[in-house]
Amino acid sequence: MFRLAWLRELIGEPAGGHEAPPVEPVAGMRFAPGPVLIACASQTGVAEDLAAATREQLRAVGIVSRVADFEALDRAMLETASQVLFLVSTTCDGDPPDMAATFSRTTMAQPASLAPLRYGLLALGDRGYEDFCGFGRALDAWLQASGAQAWFPRIEVDDEDAAALERWHAQVAALAAPVAAQRDHPCQAERPA
């Protein structure tokens, strides 16, 4: 059911008559010029659907992005990326999805050099398991140990919780707002303060 509401919101239709509260990114945090990598690790397709919706959200405001699944993701790709949105699910009791198993076992085995990297992380899980969002939490800890800086605290989703997904959407929108404003009003960006 959340998927329909999410897609309606993307195309501008009301999604049940309530809006997510405005969210501001961490002071000074916003998307930089250049493409955004959207990395997803999915077992059942939910993270892939959300990655596609996030890409569409960015495209709608003129931000170039590309989606890559964790099978294509490696240390070198992350070390050269400057901004990444991670959408990852956890399977069973804290395990990564099959497509992220190699990444988890090899790439995350030790910290990388990711100081220039800025990221957002949406962790999907099920509170019915003891290690809720275990892979998302492990990825977040590894990114921080590698020197990457989060734009906002990790957002955890319990079984496709609509409120958590709205927070994700709002955070992405807040990061994109300065880019959208500059696109809509390019002359204002050039005026001295």
Sequence positions of predicted segments:
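FMN-binding flavodoxin-like domain, especially the glycine-rich phosphate-binding loop
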Residues: 1-35, 45-46, 61, 80-81, ...
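Short amphipathic alpha-helical segments with coiled-coil-like heptad repeat character
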Residues: 55-56, 151
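A short, well-structured beta->alpha microelement
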Residues: 58-77
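Conserved active-site segments centered on acidic
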Residues: 39
